[in-house]
């Protein structure tokens, strides 16, 4: 993967000890205030980063089905909550895919109801006596530390020591090595799609030397091109 990305002149950014979420979150928070940011991901954790200049394109099924999230779309899906409250939801309901335990026995519906009413995990735990249902009260009372830890685990770290000069990460035309490498890897369609977006050293040609039309884009690429051509920072 790294060899291919290098041939496509796409910057690969990694920092030891930090996850990709943390690096993306750092850019989302610390990019210049005028920058518009798009995050393409299959991980809903990134939704906590949504604000007026950050959008998330969530890949629901591979790259063939994408849902665009802004703050309003998030509120529609989460009963009016703000994106920053996603970590409170995860604090209660957990997330097995990220090894976040949550409160055992508290599912998404109950967690959403509690956060809608009390706002944060901390407020839920401070108001256990007011919550109806003996069983739910016991679950919350017996798992306070797990809830607080889960919220912390769900929170994206946004202070990763990375270079924040966006000019260094601008997309460039693909190198001469890109086409033969994609041919070797049998990525015919991928080459055509990225040629349309990025261009290349020898024009728009497919892997077999035939001219490629400008409209030769796949579902995800076409979506991204038509939705947000003016984005300043784009992360996958």
Regions found by a protein language model. Name each.
Residues 1-162:
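Extended two-metal-dependent nuclease catalytic cores across DNA- and RNA-processing enzymes
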Residues 168-236:
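Long, highly charged low-complexity segments
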Residues 164-166:
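Short conserved micro-motifs at the rims of enzyme active sites and ligand-binding pockets
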